[in-house]
């Protein structure tokens, strides 16, 4: 490329502020926050992360090629310095607060937090969670730094991509660069599909830099095709209308997906993320156009305020939600708690944005110089020191012993429970005799209980009630996994008079056909089907299928755990799914009572 070309391009690629992108960021971060507050409210809110990825790829590439066309080079050190000032101080502030809070209020989590924090500091959280087999979509574990996986991917991208794009710009034409980036994006897509097919692990492909690169690269490609700083403002009204129709349509599709997509939908791991990200390109393209009315909509002041703070809001919302929710049972959290979480998120995000991020962005690390005469700067420095000291001590491992001690104490408390005396109700003698016989029959029976981790929870309690019961519970089991096991191992139970308890659906949705196939595999056996209580978006759909099966099939009897457990937070562990001893006892009693009632009615 000769000097004349560079001079022409220099005028075209002068950077300018793109408010439409901040407006789009606002919608993305709101979606993410709502999803983490309660996935049942916005099941596809997690797609906001993909929106961030596409925006990042687009904006960073636009800035890099703008610099290259204006100066005929890219100052990599200056680029990395800007990224460092923009991203790292806020993350370090967050980590210090989280570690200090953990030390004071959640000492049993010290060791886990130390490891997660180290991974976050070095921006390898995503690979750390993959190595630890962490499930991203398990929102019930107390992992307040888990959301930093996406920042790890972005930072890895910021570190390596400028090197790649500099090399490509020096040696190839834009058309060839676009082709190269497109091919690599397809390779990333292929890796996601293949790895997901082989492992069946949603979180591996969700966390992986290799499998998520596709989304970032689509944004990079758009930067070459639709450079924001080269777009003309003076265009015909027809073109403006066409642009707005495209932008509004794409935005409507994305918002619809936020509501209808679920994190257990398998299609999103088999090309869905790529398609959704591709559709997002059209929204971005119109959002950055200087003549678009849609861009003006995204540039409204409330959206800009949220968008400019989207990074801070993303950082703070998750640990606040996780820590506050840890004092409540998931799925039974009062509305006022959600309001408190939103207010705390806004407060901490504003503190981070105003007193940490903005000063460093303007003054660099001089903003933390120890100047007692400047009250604001002095207070900021003292706060950082107060948070930094305990954080460094935690990271050094000095409190590991304390963490182990509290962890052991908490495990012991899990076995504690309260019992209450029930009022005795007098019954007819004949009824008492039938009930007694039924109870004795049930106690001597040998039912099969098949289920997931909830079945594991009740196993020991249930066998004390019915010693001959066969318990087959497995952590993470889904209904579709149980059907082949039943057909191969439990054929003897597919006979009239046999008793089977089925407790499945906690770990993911299933279809009517899949449920029918499982029930059919038990033949004419008496099946006791347990409804589920799980604070996820599929809870209602699954229970509807369970209720319908119990109503339509004469040999299927409903064990309505969903109804019986309502208003009993003491039954559940923090996640609102797994059971404390009181819950295990209550579910066991409910199953046994249902079996006894059915046995009595038969007589």
Curated annotation (Swiss-Prot):
Entries under InterPro entries matching the protein: Acyl_transf_3_dom, Acyltransferase_3, SGNH_hydro_sf
Q: State if Heme is listed as a keyword.
A: no
Pfam families (alphabetical): Acyl_transf_3 (PF01757)
The UniProt GO MF terms for this protein read: acyltransferase activity, transferring groups other than amino-acyl groups
Q: Transmembrane helix as a keyword?
A: yes
Kindly list the residue ranges recorded as spanning the membrane: 17-37, 45-65, 87-107, 148-168, 177-197, 211-231, 239-259, 268-288, 311-331, 333-353, 382-402
CDD domains linked: SGNH_hydrolase_yrhL_like (cd01840)
State the GO CC annotations.
membrane; plasma membrane
Q: Where is the active site?
A: 453, 575, 578
As for membrane topology, the entry says: Multi-pass membrane protein
Q: Where in the cell is it found?
A: Cell membrane
The entry's keywords: Acyltransferase, Cell membrane, Membrane, Transferase, Transmembrane, Transmembrane helix, Virulence
Q: Which PANTHER family match?
A: ACETYLTRANSFERASE, ACYL_TRANSF_3 DOMAIN-CONTAINING PROTEIN
* Role noted for this protein: Responsible for O-acetylation at the C(6)-hydroxyl group of N-acetylmuramyl residues, forming the corresponding N,6-O-diacetylmuramic acid of the peptidoglycan. O-acetylation of the peptidoglycan is the major determinant for lysozyme resistance.
> What is the similarity comment for this entry?
Belongs to the acyltransferase 3 family.
Can you say what this protein is called? O-acetyltransferase OatA
**What is the species of this protein?**
Staphylococcus aureus (strain NCTC 8325 / PS 47)
